[in-house]
Every structure is written in C-alpha cells, then in structure tokens.
UniProtKB/Swiss-Prot annotation:
Designated name of the protein: DNA-directed RNA polymerase subunit beta
EC number: 2.7.7.6
Molecular-function GO terms, alphabetical: DNA binding; DNA-directed RNA polymerase activity; ribonucleoside binding
Native source species: Buchnera aphidicola subsp. Cinara cedri (strain Cc)
Role: DNA-dependent RNA polymerase catalyzes the transcription of DNA into RNA using the four ribonucleoside triphosphates as substrates.
Length: 1343
C-alpha cells in the first residue's frame, strides 16, 4: 500500500478481513454535484438555471405584438470572499445577468414581420453560491440545505386497507402525481362505483372525465369491456361460446350439442368442463330467453327506417327491450361480458349514475367543481379543462414522472410527453379495475423506488422558477403597453420577485438549516442528511409508523441506525456511505457483478427499482482468490427477503460490510455487538462532541476516521506536490516541483490557516500545521489539522483508562467518576467563543454614542477600555465588566428653577444621557480575542476603527508582498536552473530583484530565450495581479459597511471561554453509553494497578447488561492491548534499541491482521520514518476494526498476550484510599470518551426577583428569561399529601402570582417582620374573566 506523507507518521493497523473493492466516495458529493448541475450553463441540457429560463421564456404579449426571448445567462464576480462575507454578515453570492432579446412585430401585416430586435443584459438579482464545503453563507452565517426524500411523480395504486368503510371493505384507488400541476385521484366507493377527484376536491363519477375527453358511452363500453354476441335464428336464441368465460358460473340451462348433453342444468362450470367444450370445438349454444334478462346492451340500436335510437347502449335488458330487438329484425346483438369473479361491471354501473351524457355537460360539471359559484361558459369550461392536465405551462410530469408512469403501466418506452393524454387516463383506470378484479397488486408507498431525493440544485431551481413566473405576469402586461418602441429589456423586467423568492428559500425554508458545526462529523452528517419533512413532504403529525420504519430497500441507500430520537424519528435519515443519486434522483448503491458463480471486479450501481430483480450475496460471503464462492449455497437477498441460493444463481455481491450504514454509524467500532437503539444514540452523540484543546486520535477506530476528517474540509489539504518552503502558526507555503508547474502558472501555493474563529455552535475552530520545514509532500496530503482532527484523522474525544466497577455510589445511575489527573492534564478542556454585539443607533431622542465617558461609573470599571470606549484585545473579563461603553440620550425631563440655575452655572449636561454599555453576561468570564467594528458610510470613524483598519491593511499588504517575494524567488531559482543546464559559459548574474534581472541585457542562447521570455511575461502578469489585489483589498477595508436603517455602528466583541471538565458535564462513549460527571476525585483516591498507575474514569458495570451494548467492553479490551503495544515501543525507544529491532517489532505488529491486501510492508520506510512512526506509536497502536468486519475474540486475546496482559482483559486493582486489594479482578482498558456540548455552565441557573408574565403575573420559565422552576400540579399534590399547608399557601400565592401579597412580603422582610399576608392570586382573576367571556357573571361576596 502507498501511504501519504501524513499517513506514514502514524499507520492504523486494519483488522478488516474483506479486501477493499471501492474507495470511499467524496462524502459531500450529494450537495456539491447537485449545485454544480444547477449553476453550470449547458445548452440542450434541461436542468438547472438553463431549464428554468427555457420553461418560462419566450414571453409573448397578450396582443402578440411583442415578445421577450431568452438568449443566455452569465454569473458575475463575487463582491466578497467567504471569510469577508462571514465577518461582514453578508450573503456569499454572485450577480446573475441574463441576456434577453425584445422582439417587436409589425402590427398591420397579416404575416408576423419583425419590426426590430433589441438585445441587452439584464441584472436578475444575487444568487447565493455554495462554498467548497457544501454550505451557503446567508447573512454571515453558514447554512446547509438538507436534501428531501419525497414521493416521486408518477402514478400510484393503493388501497384504504379497509379502514374507510364500516364494513371493512377494501377500496382501491389510483393517484397521478405530477411534478407540478393538479393531482388526479381515481377511486372506488363502497358501492363499487368509480369516481375521480381533481386536486382532492369533491368527487364526481369517473365517466364524467371520459365524457369530457370526448368519449361517447358506446365508446367507453367498447374500451373497458369484452362482449358476448347473441343471434336469433328460427325464433331460437344462440350464443357464440367462449368456454373460459363461463368458468365458475352456475348454468341455469343445459348445454346440449347434437343431442348430446355436456353440462347439466344448475351445475357449476369447472376447468374440466371448459376443457371438454374446447375439445369438442363447440362454437355456439342455444340459450333460453330468460338467461339474457339483466344483461347490459353494449351498443346503440337504431330504428331501421327512422334511424332514431330504440335502445341506448348500457341499457339493462328486460322483456320489453328484447321484444324491440326481435321485432326490428336485428339478427345479431351485443351484450357486455361481466361476472362477479374477475370482470366486474364497474364502469357500466358508474355510467348509470352519471348524469352527463356528452362532452359539454361533462366539461361544465368539472368547471362547477373547480370554480364553484362562477357561471360556466363553454369557452371557460374548455380552457379550464385543457389547462388542468393538457397544458405544458400548467402541468408537468417531468422525465422522472413519465418514466415512473410508463413503468407502472408496463410500457416499453421510458421517455414521453410531460402532459397527460387520453391513453394515459384510460390505462390508469384499466389497471385500477384490474387490481379490483384481482389481476394486479397495489404499490408499496415506502419502497425507495417510489421515493426520490430532491437535492439543493433542484430546490433552488424550483424556487427560481416560482420567481420567474411572478416576473412573467408583470412582463406580459408591460409588453401590451403602447410605448414599446422606446423600451429596453431592462425597463420591462423587475428582478425583485426573483431575488425575494431565493432569499425566502435560503432564509426561511424548513430545509435551509443553520449548520450544525459542533465538530467535523456534525458538519458532514448535516450535509448528508435526508429529510422527509419540508415543502411538498410529510408533516410530523401526519406521518405514521410505516413511513418511519426501516424498509428492505433502505439497504445500502439509507442508514437503518442514524436517525434522531423524538418526534422526527425515521423522518430524518442519513445517506449510507456508498449511496448516490442517479439521473432521476433515486438512490442507488454499488454492487460487484457475479458471473456463473465467480465474483468479478466490475461494479454496478443499482437503484431500488432494479435491485428487486436480482439475487445479491452478502459482502462477507467467503470467496477464494479466483473469486469463486466456497460454499454451494450462499445467503442472499432477493426481492427484500433473505434466503439460501445456489452460487451459480447469484447475480451481484455487496461491495463492503459497511455499505448499509452512514458515516456516523460507521465510526462506531464493534457496532455489530451493540443493540440498535444504543448504536443510534452513539451515532447521534458523536455529533455533539466538543473539540478539545488537544485532539487525540482514537486507539480503537474503524478506519473511516481519515476519510471523514479530509472530506469535512476542516483540515488543509495540499493542492499540488512540493516542498514546505515556510511554515508558522498561521501560514504554510509550499514550493511546487518544477515538473508539476504548467506554463503561466505560479510555482508556489500559499495556505492561510484559520485561527481561533467561532463556529455556529460557539465552539472554537483552529488549525494547526502538522508538517515541518523542508518536508516533501504530495498532492492530497494533510498539511494542517483542524478542530477535532489529529494527523488527518477524526479525533472527537480522548482515550481514557477506564475501570468497570462501583465506587462508593458515585457511579449510580450512569454517573461517571473522574480522576483529578484528567482535569489537570486538560484532557477535556474546551474553548468556547462567544460573540457579543453592541449596536449604536440613531434614536428619536438623538444619536447614541460609543465612548469611554460614561456617567456614574468609576475609573476602575473603565480601566480596560481604550479612549474610544472599546475594550482592549487580550483583556481578561468577568461577569458585569464593561466591554463597550455606550450612552443613550434620555427623554428631556421638566426641570425645577433651582436645577435650571445649577445647570446654567456648572454646565451639567451628563444627566441627559443614560448608560447603555455592553457588559459581560451573567456567569461568563473569559478573554477578549477579537474586536470588529462596522461603521455606516458617512459616519465619522473613531480612533479604534482607524487603528483596526490600518492593522488589516498592513497585514494584507504584508501578506501580498511576501507572496510576491516568494514568487520572485521561485522564478529566480527557475531561471538559475535553466542557466545551469547550459554547457556554454554565461557571466554570473547578481540581482536583488527580478526587475534588475530582466533589465540586464544578456544574450541568451536561442534554446532558452523562449523559456526566459515566458517567465518574464509570467512575472509581469503576477505584478499586475498583485497591484490589483492590493487595490481591491484596500478599497474593501476602507469602504463603509452596509448596515440596517437606523444603525450607525456595530461593535462585535469575541470572548474566548476556557471550560475544564466539571461535575454536571455530560460525557459519553461511542456506544450510546452516556452519563454525567458526578465527582472529580483526587488522583491518590482512585483505584490503581500493580505498577501504581491510577484509573482515569470509573464506570458502572450495571450500565452494560441491560443496554446490550457490548461493543464498549470489547473496545476496552482492545484499547488495553493497543496501549500495551505502545508501552513496549516506548520502552524500546527509552532503552535506545537499535532501529532494525524496532523495525522488526513494528513489522510483527503490523502483520497481525488476516487480510493479505492490507498488510503493511515497512521495508520501503527510511530509518527516520521508522523512528518517527515509533515515536507516534508510543502512546498506543491505533487499530481499525471496520463495522461488521471487525477484530474477533481470538485476535483480541492474541494482542493482549503480545502486550503482556491477561487474556481475560481483567487486572488486579488496589483501593487508592486504603491501599487494599479489591476482592475480584476488574475489567480495565482504554475507552474513547467524548465530552458533549451539554455543559453544566450553560445550564446552571438561579432566579432572584425577576420578570413576570403579563397576564398570569407568574414568574417566567427558563434560563434565557431569567425564570423560575415550575411548581406544577403533581408537586402541589405532594405538599398536600404531607399536609404542609403554610408552604403550600406560600407557593400558590406570594411566591407565584399574588401581586399585592408579594410586595407586602418584600416590605415585611425589609422591616424585619417574618409574616406574610396572602391575597388573591392573579390566576383566579384570569379564571373569573374567562368565565365572564362565556356570559356567566361571577362576583365574590366579601361577607
């Protein structure tokens, strides 16, 4: 295996048994690819912006004299980059400009001749851009647009499962769902009549729709029924016999042919009878007249002479009707073939209740339902009906819908029209009738072939189209105006509706969410989330159990483990690792092709639609080196069921054992040994882990850690191979290898690191270089670690030495006992950054002012402020300290003559203003790490603002000049290299800068003249580019900020708060084993082992059996072995063992896994690399145990033996307080523990006198409102049960909502009296008022 520079520093030993078939795909591709498709203009490619424009344009005026045509669109240059957008609180976007043509036609001519064409680029608003990490920056905050899993357009056949009607009769229905347009439902009622509903309105007989489609009753019967043909001969009635139609009937007559009786009267016809009749080739049989009564005529019968209708089609035959047929010499007549078994007379019965008889009455009936109360006219009714399903502007099935529609009706072609046609509606009704007749099955609505994923690009496109439709209406009206000749396209188009539609979507849509940025895993999971909620999706209240449940088609597409607990369970899911969406938006997952029992390397992605037809083997099925199955019968999945199949019949095989789970679940080692409920909690809690100051990789991982850390975008990845030229805490410079540099490309890459910036969840984002000067790196190497990453691997927590044992009740109910050593070593110390804003407004009474001159505040309180009244960076502050001094004008009060006099003498003006400074909130203390000041254009900048601007300018110029210098040096080196290759002598050139270099007139040989000329041009271009950059940067820094109306200045203060672990903080492992820290114990009191090494964390052993998450125990054992190997390496390094011995031991360790493909060969490593590897392994050997393919018991024991521990994984411990040995051996090992973002500091809260609710006069609730604890109904019962009457009275009156009582109480306490006078609780008054609102008067009698 080839390892990157960073990987070589610390190799994770992989114990997976399965070979790696497919690399883990880029984990953010679902977001990034979707937006790319939306934004990139491609002709003839109907998707994205292009498709939206094509669907709306050209827009014609009502009178047809003018039209506006779309030509193309371009995206402009972004005003601010990502970092600037975040700091300034603006949206990271680009201007969208569209080239339009206004074509004006001549009015007079009959032919439409073009009078003139005007072309112009029109500004269509700002389009938010996606960052390289798959997020959007909207108003300065990072947001994620979550993909939606919604019901695919198409046709669905379903039933009510017998729940609608009291009889329990199953009523079948079909629903045609377009991508946009009206829904059409076809349904049976309990009487077996067929009805339709348009847009879920009142139902009408289905034949009304057929009449509206211009089908006559006769035609309808011909389409939906087969006919029995009868004829009259010699006054006898004969029937053309089709034997299979008689099956199951009880015949009321004998069947006799040539005097031979085949079937007796009253006999039920069976398959045997049918075979007999077929064999004898009986074509006609004589029947009695009564057999015809009750049957339905299928054609109109006319009078031979007058041609008037004698008998209408769909008439039930009676004796009178039959006599008419006889009398008018109709030899042949046609009757509908129906029966009660598999040919119901549903359409015929529906026609009988249908009052409409022709197209016009049917159209008017539909019009009345869609537009109740409006008088119908023929034109209006026709227009409405055509617009419902047959107009491309109003109705679109979309390619997906058409594909699903055709597939459902078993048609061959996948493509077709986006609107419905007559055949579509008839085929849907036919299929529904077949299902009712028992000749088909209903669809499974939760099958993933019926649900598709709508990603960002598609949602933004829909929103954009909505905006364009609003614009279209306005444009149509403007085009009908008379003064078109003077107008240009930009005068006609108003882009407001488009930008407001897009703003609304990104700002307030249910699927555009504030990014979860606790740690890199939280980010990735949020971007890979798939929600069934949102516009056009489900609602929490209406979603039943079936929708939320795990479905067999989720396999490899949607994770069965990771979903939130609570009301959203099962509605919000996570994409599986290898899953992707296909062109139609259906989820697909990869499989290996199997041919004749041999597994090939060919990989095919299958969607849920295709997967049902194949037999698919498990990923862990044993195969030999030639790809043949070991066993004759293999466990496989087929059509959602498990079973044993012959190996020759297998079509595909899973790609990997972790194929079924999501990224979050795949990070849980030994997931296969955990109960699913706990695994769900484990996957969810990893997302809540707070990045610690010192990140530490897990000793026991799953091998997914590197992919997550790199794809999340928090680390810095090398774009090109090269050598580290310069490195410090905030910048890395890489010099590119000459052969990798293309012409006109700079030979240097500069990476600026993010330092101590605030995340959405107030955690700290900080990048730290993990390379050294002069290191050689390759493209894709990790250059710097971000939050929660360690050498390019995800590191959410810390490896802790844990023991499972009770300790004095301190680990009762999942509590966690922690050693003081953990706190002292800052293992779980985290940094939280708070942003506090001070806004300076222009009020009605005057302008607020930021100043250090604040009334009634002592010098000491202002000691940390500068002259402008803003705190210094680096100041340590605690709650109540002034951060920004601000004064607000007071309302003018009426002064007494004496005050006026005093004011005239002493010029006292300070009382006109009140102190409204920004202070540190309660319970917070920290260090000021940054100050940002935003000033409105035209407002005079204060001294501090100018200082900050100068500092930013200096930094920007320094950055750019240094960059230019590095590029210069680089070009000089390249020139020198070129000169050195020459054999001829050239005088040595000494020059301080390239300008001097190029000024010297040197005659170069022809060979290299061109190369040097190219470098010269490149340098000139670079200089130009840098001058432009400096100009732009200066302009951006100096220009005023766009602030909301009425705001003059905003000062943002960033406070860094360091939080150590403390009792009350929530901690968890990766297996759903969560608990609260109960005590931080002195290290000398903790249990210790034979070597005197104390335990870090003591956990409760009772937390394991009932929860069934044994993964934590196996992790503990494996962690112990990994640490043991680290100890051996550490001893070897300490005793200065020879490098070859270290190499030999490391090779032995890395050869432990079973998989030959994952064996690591250390022969290619240099001695320095081996030494570095050993130093990084002294803390412990990192092990990967992939999900469902992990380390087994035998291997754990082997590792424990190798690291000189008992194979039981238990050791003898001694009590730290008494020094006595514990009675039994204790399970001790290393577990990866996380500190979750549920910190006691954020939750701890106490209320003194605070705010009250306006109506009930009771204290508010919650920390944010400075509220109290609710004393509820059950708590009142408790006091009643104890008979604590005084306490109860106090609780219900003075401590709650007795307004007069509480003021008296306050007075009494002040004056030293300790008695209370309870009055009337306010809530009683509220009750009285509410009863009065019902018209009942209540008055209290004072007697």
């Amino acid at each position: 295996m080839i390892y990157s520079y960073t990987e070589k520093k610390r190799i994770r030993e992989n114990f997976g048994k399965q070979p790696k078939i497919l690399d883990i795909p880029y984990l953010l591709s679902i977001q990034i690819d979707s937006f790319k498709k939306f934004i990139e203009p491609k002709k003839n490619n109907y998707q994205g912006l292009e498709s939206a424009f094509q669907s709306i344009f050209p827009i014609r005026s009502y009178n047809g004299c003018a039209e506006l045509q779309y030509v193309s669109y371009t995206l402009g240059k972004k005003l601010f980059d990502m970092y600037e957008s975040k700091t300034r609180g603006t949206t990271y976007s680009v201007p969208l400009r569209v080239k339009l043509q206004l074509i004006i036609y001549e009015k007079d001519s009959k032919n439409t001749n073009v009078k003139h064409i005007k072309e112009q680029e029109v500004y269509m608003g700002e389009l938010p851009l996606m960052t390289h990490n798959g997020t959007f920056i909207i108003n300065g905050t990072e947001r994620v647009v979550v993909s939606q899993l919604h019901r695919s357009p198409g046709v669905f056949f379903d039933s009510d499962k017998g729940k609608t009607h009291s009889s329990g009769k199953i009523l079948y229905n079909a629903r045609i769902i377009p991508y946009r347009g009206s829904w059409l439902d076809v349904e049976f009622d309990p009487k077996d009549h067929l009805f339709i509903r348009i847009d879920r309105r009142r139902k009408i007989p289905a034949t009304v729709l057929l009449h509206a489609l211009n089908f006559s009753t006769e035609k309808i019967l011909k389409i939906f029924f087969k006919h029995d043909i009868f004829y009259i001969k010699n006054k006898n009635i004969y029937m053309y016999l089709i034997p299979k139609r008689l099956k199951g009937e009880i015949i009321p007559f004998e069947i006799i042919k040539n005097k031979k009786r085949y079937i007796k009267k009253g006999e039920r016809i069976t398959t045997e009878h049918i075979k007999k009749l077929k064999k004898k080739k009986i074509k006609t049989i004589q029947i009695p007249e009564e057999y015809l009564y009750g049957k339905t005529i299928s054609k109109n019968y006319y009078h031979p002479k007058t041609k008037e209708i004698l008998i209408k089609s769909n008439t039930t035959l009676t004796q009178d009707e039959f006599n008419k047929i006889k009398n008018f010499n109709n030899k042949k007549f046609y009757v509908l073939f129906t029966n009660n078994i598999d040919n119901g007379a549903y359409i015929s019965e529906t026609l009988k209740i249908d009052t409409t008889k022709d197209r016009l009455t049917a159209l008017i009936e539909i019009y009345k339902i869609m537009r109740p109360g409006e008088p119908p006219t023929k034109e209006a009714a026709e227009n409405l009906f055509n617009n419902l399903f047959f107009s491309q502007e109003r109705y679109d099935l979309s390619p997906v819908g058409r594909m699903k529609f055709n597939k459902s009706l078993k048609r061959k072609e996948k493509k077709g029209s986006g609107i419905l046609n007559k055949e579509d509606i008839i085929d849907v009704i036919k299929k529904l009738i077949n299902i009712k007749n028992g000749k088909g099955e209903i669809d499974d609505i939760d099958h993933l072939s019926n649900r598709r994923v709508r990603s960002v690009g598609e949602m933004v496109e829909n929103q954009f189209r909505i905006g364009l439709v609003r614009v279209e209406r306005a444009v149509r009206e403007r085009l009908s105006l008379s003064d078109l000749d003077t107008l240009m396209p930009q005068d006609i188009i108003n882009a407001k509706p488009i930008s407001s539609a897009i703003k609304e979507f990104f700002g307030s849509s249910q699927l555009s969410q504030f990014m979860d940025q606790n740690n890199p895993l939280a980010e990735i999971t949020h971007k890979r989330r798939i929600s069934a909620l949102g516009i056009g999706g489900l609602t929490r209240e209406r979603a039943g159990f079936e929708v939320r449940d795990v479905h067999p088609t989720h396999y490899g597409r949607v994770c069965p483990v990771e979903t939130p607990e609570g009301p959203n369970i099962g509605l919000i899911n996570s994409l599986s690792i290898y899953a992707r969406t296909n062109q139609y938006g259906f989820l697909e997952t990869p499989y290996r092709k199997v041919k004749n029992g041999t597994v090939t390397t060919k990989i095919k992605y299958l969607s849920a639609i295709e997967e049902g037809n194949y037999i698919i083997a498990q990923a862990n099925t044993k195969i030999n080196k030639f790809g043949k199955f070991y066993k004759k019968f293999v466990t496989c999945r087929y059509n959602g069921e498990f079973g044993l199949f012959k190996n020759k019949k297998v079509n595909y095989m899973d790609i990997s054992t972790q194929q079924i789970v999501s990224v979050g679940a795949s990070l849980i080692p030994f997931l296969e040994h955990d109960d699913a409920n706990r695994a769900l909690m484990g996957a969810n809690m990893q997302r809540q882990a707070v990045p610690t100051i010192k990140s530490e990789k897990p000793l026991v991982g799953t091998g997914m850690e590197r992919s997550v850390a790199i794809d999340s975008g928090v680390t810095i990845i090398a774009k090109r191979s090269g050598k580290i030229e310069y490195v410090d805490a905030s910048r890395i410079v890489v010099r590119i290898k000459d052969e990798k540099i293309r012409t006109y490309e700079s030979g240097i890459d500069i990476y600026n690191l993010t330092k101590y910036s605030r995340s959405n969840q107030n955690t700290c984002i900080n990048q730290i270089p993990c390379i050294n000067l002069n290191d050689s790196i390759k493209k894709g190497d990790v250059l710097a670690d971000g939050p929660s990453t360690d050498l390019g691997e995800l590191a959410l927590g810390q490896n802790m030495r844990v023991a499972f044992m009770p300790w004095n009740g301190y680990n009762f109910e999942d509590s966690i006992l922690i050693s003081e050593k953990v706190e002292r070593e800052d293992k779980f110390t985290t940094i939280h950054i708070q942003e506090l804003s001070c806004i300076c407004r222009d009020t009605k009474l005057g302008i607020e002012e930021i100043t250090s001159d604040i009334p009634n505040i002592g010098e000491s309180a202002l000691s940390k402020l500068d002259t402008s009244g803003i705190i210094y960076i680096g100041a340590d502050v605690s709650s109540g300290d002034v951060l920004v001094g601000k004064v607000t004008p007071k309302g003018e009060t009426q002064l007494t003559p004496e005050e006026k006099l005093l004011r005239a003498i002493f010029g006292e003006k300070a009382s006109d203003v009140k102190d409204s400074s920004l202070r540190v909130p309660n319970g917070t203390n920290g260090t000021v790490i940054d100050v940002q000041i935003f000033t409105r254009d035209g407002v005079k900048k204060d001294k501090r603002t100018i200082e900050i601007e100068e500092m930013l300018l200096k930094k920007a110029k320094k950055d750019l000049t240094e960059e230019l210098k590095i590029f210069e040096l680089n070009i000089i080196n390249r020139i020198n290299k070129i000169l050195l290759t020459l054999k001829t002598k050239i005088n040595c050139i000494v020059a301080n800068s390239l300008n001097e270099y190029f000024k010297k007139k040197i005659k170069y040989p022809k060979k290299i003249k061109k190369k040097i000329h190219t470098l010269k041009i490149q340098y000139k271009q670079l200089q130009k580019k840098f001058k432009k950059k400096i100009k732009e940067k200066t302009k951006k820094i100096i220009q005023g900020d766009e602030l909301a109306p009425g705001i003059l200045k905003i000062v943002k203060i960033f406070l860094a708060v360091k939080r150590k672990i403390q009792p009350g903080d929530k901690m968890a492992g990766r297996h759903g084993n969560k608990g609260v820290v109960s005590k931080i114990n002195p290290v000398e009191d903790m249990p210790y082992d034979n070597n005197g090494e104390p335990i870090d964390i003591v956990l409760n052993p009772l937390g394991v059996p009932s929860r069934m998450n044994l993964g934590q125990i196996l992790e503990t054992h494996l962690g112990l072995a990994a640490k043991g190997i680290g100890n051996i390496i550490n001893r070897m390094l300490k005793t200065n063992k020879k490098i070859y011995k270290i190499r030999k031991f490391l090779q032995k360790v890395y050869n432990l896994g079973e998989n030959i493909n994952q064996k690591i060969n250390l022969d290619n490593f240099s001695d320095i690399e081996i030494l570095q590897l050993a130093k990084n392994l002294r803390i412990g050997l990192p092990i990967a145990t992939p999900v469902f393919d992990g380390v087994n018991e035998k291997e754990i024991k082997k590792l424990l033996k190798m690291s000189n521990f008992s194979t039981s994984g238990q050791i003898t411990l001694f009590d730290g307080r008494t020094g006595e040995k514990f009675e039994r051996n204790v399970t001790v090992g290393y577990m990866y523990m996380l500190k979750l973002n549920h910190l006691v500091d954020d939750k701890m809260h106490a209320r003194s006198t605070g705010s009250y609710s306006l109506i009930t006069q009771q204290p508010l609730g919650g920390k944010a409102q400075f509220g109290g604890q609710r004393f509820g109904e059950m708590e009142v019962w408790a006091l009643e049960a104890y008979g604590a009457s005084h306490t109860l009275q106090e609780m219900l009156t003075v401590k709650s909502d007795d307004v007069t009582g509480r003021t008296k109480m306050y007075k009494n306490i002040v004056s030293g009296k300790h008695n209370m006078e309870p009055g009337m609780p306010e809530s009683f008054n509220v009750l009285v008022k509410e009863i009065r609102s019902l018209g009942i008067n209540i008055e209290l009698n004072n007697n």
